[in-house]
Amino acid sequence: MKPRLSVLTIGVDDLEKSLRFYRDGLGLATIGSVGTEFEHGAVVFIDLQAGVKLALYPRRSLAHDAGIAAQPSGATEFSIGHNVSSKPEADAVMEQAKAALRQALGTLRPE
C-alpha cells in the first residue's frame, strides 16, 4: 500500500471561530459547516490542494468518535507547516495569520 494523505483533522474548541480564522482570515476555500444536524457530526472541510482537505472538528466530538474522554487543550498538540522561500514572505504570512486571529478571536496577546 502506498500511503496517501487525504484528510488532516484538527480538533478545535470553537468550530465557528476556527471557520472564521481559516476562511475569512486566511482566505481558504470551504463551504462552511456540514453535518450540524447530527450530534457529534458538525465539521468544516477546507480544500488545501487537489485531493487533500483540512477538517476542523470539535475536540469533544473527535474524542467521542475515538471512544476516549476529551482532554484539556494545549498549544503543543499539533502544528501545521507553511513553507515559504524568503524572510519577507514569512513575515507576510505571519502578519496575515495574526490578522486572521484578531478577526476570529477579537483579541491577540502582544508578543
Residue ranges and their predicted role:
Residues 1-19, 37, 77-82:
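N-terminal beta-strand motif that seeds the catalytic metal site of vicinal oxygen chelate
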Residues 6, 29-31, 105-106:
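A short, local hydrophobic-aromatic micro-motif
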Residues 7, 43-45, 90:
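Residue-level detection of beta-strand scaffold positions
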Residues 11-54, 59-61:
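Core segments of cupin and vicinal oxygen chelate
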Residues 13-16, 77-111:
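Vicinal oxygen chelate
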Residues 54, 64, 88-90:
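Residue-level signal for secondary-structure boundary sites
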Residues 65-70:
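Short beta-strand/turn micro-motifs at beta-sheet edges
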Residues 71-75:
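Short glycine/proline- and charge-enriched loop/turn segments
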